[in-house]
Amino acid sequence: MADQANQPTVLHKLGGQFHLRSIISEGVRARNICPSVSSYERRFATRNYMTQSLWGPSMSVSGGINVPVMQTPLCANAPAEKGGKNFMIDFMMGGVSAAVSKTAAAPIERVKLLIQNQDEMIKSGRLSEPYKGIVDCFKRTIKDEGFSSLWRGNTANVIRYFPTQALNFAFKDYFKRLFNFKKDRDGYWKWFAGNLASGGAAGASSLFFVYSLDYARTRLANDAKAAKGGGERQFNGLVDVYRKTLKSDGIAGLYRGFNISCVGIIVYRGLYFGLYDSIKPVVLTGNLQDNFFASFALGWLITNGAGLASYPIDTVRRRMMMTSGEAVKYKSSLDAFQQILKKEGPKSLFKGAGANILRAIAGAGVLSGYDQLQILFFGKKYGSGGA
């Protein structure tokens, strides 16, 4: 098999961004290739939301999935040939695409975060009783805060796209050259290790600059206005999150959970590529080898499987975020993991995972429709935001 880091297969494209998707993107893709194709060639573009909210090798577990679309390949020049103007159009349209998809999935995203972090909210007295499930969380949130509150924290999530894309564009080529291992030349394990190292390094580098926005988004989304608590919120907006956190905890408060987030990037990539290379040769054989729907199904299972397996890491990092400004904090990510297991049980590490999968489906449909509108009005599909 050819070097999959440089020549991604359909299944790799299905993998897309991880749910920390929510955090790491492959960045702006250079459109400088005009492939030679027959009239029967199919091109499918797929991105994953899931784990978008977590991390991505790029699920990006963030990100979303574009429902497969057959279309004639469109030729475009490289950014250097197109000039800065057209590059900025691609960049901005990618931002619009990200804003549309993230905004559409924001209600489910907020419910996911509320369910995931409800135990921290109960401990701090900001939630009177636990949620009974996704439907109960929706009902109570709308009843106590109003329908528009389902989008609380979405602004920070949308803003985060632009610096993430710019940083990924800057970092991805550097680390790709630094860890330039090829599967057919250097062997599987060197390629695998290089993939983890380059993805982890690029992801951590980008994450360092945008982590505070993810922190702010998490705190705003979990700032419930319970009717029984008098309807008072902890934060009045994005700027207020920064102001109060810096006052109580300093810079460290904005980066609580950063280390385990970087670990999550590597864990997800290891699970994703490990599962891909182990399962694909066994399952996609014979007539299924070039079957798109079989590849789609396997890709969906692998990305969600890797996302669910690494979901506890996302829970730990977000639970650590929730302690900034509070009197009692976890000593470390390991301490947080141990305390959650001891006091709440392993099930607590997976709270909100169901809503996370629903968010992937919702974002996929909206992003697919938006891409088709771009083709209809502009004659091409601009970059989609999966960060």
From Swiss-Prot:
Residues 1-77 form a transit peptide. A motif (Nucleotide carrier signature motif) lies at residues 317-322. One of its GO terms (cellular component) is mitochondrial inner membrane. The keyword Mitochondrion applies. It is a multi-pass membrane protein. Keywords: Antiport, Membrane, Mitochondrion, Mitochondrion inner membrane, Repeat, Transit peptide, Transmembrane, Transmembrane helix, Transport. The matrix-open state (m-state) is inhibited by the membrane-permeable bongkrekic acid (BKA). The cytoplasmic-open state (c-state) is inhibited by the membrane-impermeable toxic inhibitor carboxyatractyloside (CATR). Its main location: mitochondrion. ADP binds at residues 160, 172, 317. It comes from the Eukaryota. PROSITE patterns: SOLCAR. Solcar repeats lie at residues 85-178, 190-282, 290-376. GO terms for molecular function: ATP:ADP antiporter activity. The transmembrane helices are not perpendicular to the plane of the membrane, but cross the membrane at an angle. At least 2 of the odd-numbered transmembrane helices exhibit a sharp kink, due to the presence of a conserved proline residue. Monomer. Belongs to the mitochondrial carrier (TC 2.A.29) family. ADP:ATP antiporter that mediates import of ADP into the mitochondrial matrix for ATP synthesis, and export of ATP out to fuel the cell. Cycles between the cytoplasmic-open state (c-state) and the matrix-open state (m-state): operates by the alternating access mechanism with a single substrate-binding site intermittently exposed to either the cytosolic (c-state) or matrix (m-state) side of the inner mitochondrial membrane. This is ADP,ATP carrier protein 1, mitochondrial. It comes from Zea mays.
